[in-house]
């Protein structure tokens, strides 16, 4: 006979542990426990039977896996937190006694912890980390716009701003931006990096205030993890693109509000000059130094790559590079040299979408009322050149009088004023469009007509490029055939009156048969009279009736069978699954009703516009 199981020693009571017991086992404070759970990715679990998991108690509490808590007990960060607690006591005691030298020594040796090992544990591969940076980017861009307070140090905000600009630099360099949506919350961006779709939200540049009901400590813990994660990801992305990470920052340009232009992207093949003091070796009676050997190797393997700069150059210098493409040929001086084959890093950094260089032939000028940070990033990510006035910051590659400007992004009403012939000629050579034209062109994947978005005109609706769900309402899609027939009946009736009258009558009879019930003789008789009035042959009408009855019978039978199967499946569900199923059905019906309401409103607006 087997040994009897004691109550609370097996099953759910052993697999789960309450939060109070976990804090007691780890011997840490509740704040440190929350920080550990956030950093390690441990979250509360829901046991099947809460009463059994809580050893007979029905008091509300949070449960965790016992193995997760045992995993936390060996965490190096927990050890550092305990050391920091002891350090805080020693520092407080030294300050209370006035031992300033001891307090200074303690401050210099303050225990710190690193999160590198946690990033490696949570993200074994680079693709796993890349898929999880959406929230990290949103958090970093949010904190980059917040003001510094006592709870939010200035160093954290500066680091978030630096990380956000490094990400924008990479997206602009690789032309990875795919979709943009200007919403009430902010600007939604979607980029495609190494075949992974990354979406993030950037708030508008307004003065932000931290709400009092927001727990900043929890957000700072997430931010601490995300900053370390982005550092790993950016280093890998920059290395694969043959760029130096972190990119050098020009302090003078940064102080003058140059934005992303304060950073310089440098290729890893361009090495800084330094004095070569190596040994000299005699080769065939000639003295050869280490510098000569390196130069010879570089000339054989490949030519030096020039420095890459995010700032746009002059139009005369940029146009030949856009028109001509370099084609690798075998060297005449070294016929044995083989042309370099494309590698995975080259292919991953190459734009995969034809719309990624959408604005390459154009030069834009941003008016002072447009957001420079948004449209500079959008336009440069698609190969365009952009300039701005001095009031928007320094670093503009050209001024407003430049002859190469093709589009002016302006967001102000038209003001009638006297223009000189030179100003009139300059205006005729440029397209003055509203900012929405840039975003809609990117989402459409082509250059839209500028007349619709001209200065002062009523703009078309700005639609989200992100698909919500299958079967969602699409304002750009045409209505169904019946709606189109109703709308175009008055327009096309006169033009096609002498055309295919029989075909239109046949279609009308088919529509009537589809709407009537075949088991109702009165309805069939009414359809027969309508066919006779339309001049339709009786044999053709009989054929239509048989076809309609055949098409309706299987539909009715299949619908009844489907409903019966659904009822049987619901009977086999548990109570929890049935409630979840009912919630799903309710949400689907609600979405369908909302879609039908929007379609009806669209039809009414179209009819009102037609009148």
Swiss-Prot record:
Known partners and oligomeric status: Component of the NOP7 complex, composed of ERB1, NOP7 and YTM1. The complex is held together by ERB1, which interacts with NOP7 via its N-terminal domain and with YTM1 via a high-affinity interaction between the seven-bladed beta-propeller domains of the 2 proteins. The NOP7 complex associates with the 66S pre-ribosome.
User: What is stated as this protein's family in its record?
Assistant: Belongs to the pescadillo family.
Q: Which residues form a coiled coil?
A: 580-609
Keyword DNA repair attributed: no
Q: Which residues form the BRCT domain?
A: 354-455
Summary of the function given for this chain in its UniProt record: Component of the NOP7 complex, which is required for maturation of the 25S and 5.8S ribosomal RNAs and formation of the 60S ribosome.
Compartment annotation? Nucleus, Nucleolus; Nucleus, Nucleoplasm
Which SUPFAM superfamilies did the record assign?
Answer: BRCT domain
Q: Name one GO molecular function term.
A: ribonucleoprotein complex binding
- Database matches in Pfam families: BRCT (PF00533), Pescadillo_N (PF06732)
Biological process according to GO: maturation of 5.8S rRNA from tricistronic rRNA transcript (SSU-rRNA, 5.8S rRNA, LSU-rRNA); maturation of LSU-rRNA from tricistronic rRNA transcript (SSU-rRNA, 5.8S rRNA, LSU-rRNA)
Its source organism is: Coprinopsis cinerea (strain Okayama-7 / 130 / ATCC MYA-4618 / FGSC 9003)
User: What Gene3D superfamilies does the record point to?
Assistant: BRCT domain
Compositionally biased tracts (Basic and acidic residues):
552-569, 579-602
Q: Which UniProt keywords apply?
A: Coiled coil, Nucleus, Ribosome biogenesis, rRNA processing
Task: Return the protein name.
Answer: Pescadillo homolog
The gene is NOP7
Give Gene Ontology CC terms.
Answer: nucleoplasm; PeBoW complex; preribosome, large subunit precursor
Where are the stretches annotated Disordered? 310-335, 469-506, 545-611
PANTHER family reported for this sequence? PESCADILLO - RELATED, PESCADILLO HOMOLOG
UniProt lists compositionally biased (Acidic residues) regions at 314-325, 482-498
């Amino acid at each position: 006979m087997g040994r009897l199981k004691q109550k609370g020693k097996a099953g759910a009571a052993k697999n789960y542990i309450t939060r109070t017991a976990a804090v007691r086992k780890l011997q840490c404070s509740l704040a440190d426990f929350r920080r550990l759970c956030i950093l390690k990715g441990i979250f509360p679990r829901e046991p099947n039977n809460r009463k059994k998991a809580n050893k007979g108690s029905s008091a509300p509490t949070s449960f965790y896996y016992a193995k997760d808590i045992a995993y936390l007990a060996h965490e190096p960060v927990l050890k550092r937190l305990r050391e920091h607690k002891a350090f805080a006591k020693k520092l407080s005691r030294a300050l209370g006694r006035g031992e300033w030298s001891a307090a200074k020594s303690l401050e210099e040796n303050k225990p710190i912890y690193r999160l590198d090992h946690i990033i490696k544990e949570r993200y074994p591969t680079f693709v796993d980390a890349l898929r999880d940076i959406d929230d990290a980017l949103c958090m970093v861009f949010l904190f980059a716009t917040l003001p510094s307070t006592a709870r939010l140090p200035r160093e954290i905000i500066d680091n978030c701003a630096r990380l956000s600009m490094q990400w924008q630099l990479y997206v602009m360099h690789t032309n990875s931006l795919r979709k943009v949506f200007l919403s009430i919350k902010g600007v939604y961006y979607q980029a495609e990096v190494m075949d992974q779709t990354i979406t993030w939200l950037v708030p508008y540049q307004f003065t932000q205030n931290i709400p009092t009901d927001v727990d900043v400590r929890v957000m700072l813990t997430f931010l601490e993890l995300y900053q370390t994660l982005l550092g790993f990801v950016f280093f890998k992305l920059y290395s694969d693109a043959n760029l130096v990470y972190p990119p050098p920052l020009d302090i003078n340009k940064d102080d003058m509000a140059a934005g992303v232009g304060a950073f310089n992207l440098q290729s890893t093949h361009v090495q800084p000059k330094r004095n070569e003091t190596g040994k000299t070796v005699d080769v065939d009676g000639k003295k050869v130094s280490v510098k000569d050997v390196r130069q010879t190797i570089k000339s054989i393997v490949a030519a030096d790559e020039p420095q890459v700069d995010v700032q746009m150059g002059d139009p005369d210098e940029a146009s030949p590079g856009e028109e001509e493409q370099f084609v690798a040929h075998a060297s005449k001086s070294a016929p044995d040299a083989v042309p370099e084959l494309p590698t995975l890093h080259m292919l991953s950094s190459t734009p995969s979408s034809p719309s990624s260089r959408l604005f390459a032939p154009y030069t834009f000028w941003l008016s002072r009322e447009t957001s420079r940070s948004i449209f500079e990033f959008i336009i440069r990510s698609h190969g365009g050149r952009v300039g701005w006035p001095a009031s928007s910051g320094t670093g503009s590659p050209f001024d407003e009088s430049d002859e190469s400007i093709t589009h002016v992004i302006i967001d102000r009403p038209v003001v009638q004023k006297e223009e000189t012939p030179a100003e009139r000629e300059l205006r005729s050579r440029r397209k003055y469009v509203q900012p929405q034209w840039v975003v809609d062109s990117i989402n459409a994947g082509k250059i839209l007509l500028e007349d619709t978005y001209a200065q002062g005109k009523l703009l078309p609706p700005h639609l989200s490029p992100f698909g919500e769900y299958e079967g969602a309402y699409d304002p750009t899609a045409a209505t169904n055939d019946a709606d189109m027939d109703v709308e175009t009946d008055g327009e096309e009736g006169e033009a096609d009156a002498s055309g295919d009258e029989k075909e239109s009558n046949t279609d009308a009879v088919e529509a009537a048969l589809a709407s009537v019930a075949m088991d109702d003789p009165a309805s069939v008789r009414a359809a027969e009279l309508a066919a006779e009035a339309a001049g339709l042959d009786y044999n053709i009408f009989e054929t239509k009736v048989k076809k309609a009855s055949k098409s309706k019978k299987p539909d009715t039978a299949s619908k009844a069978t489907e409903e019966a199967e659904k009822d049987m499946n619901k009977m086999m569900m548990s109570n929890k699954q049935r409630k979840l199923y009912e919630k799903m059905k309710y949400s689907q019906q609600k979405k369908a009703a909302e879609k039908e309401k929007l379609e009806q409103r669209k039809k009414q607006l179209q009819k009102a516009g037609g009148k």
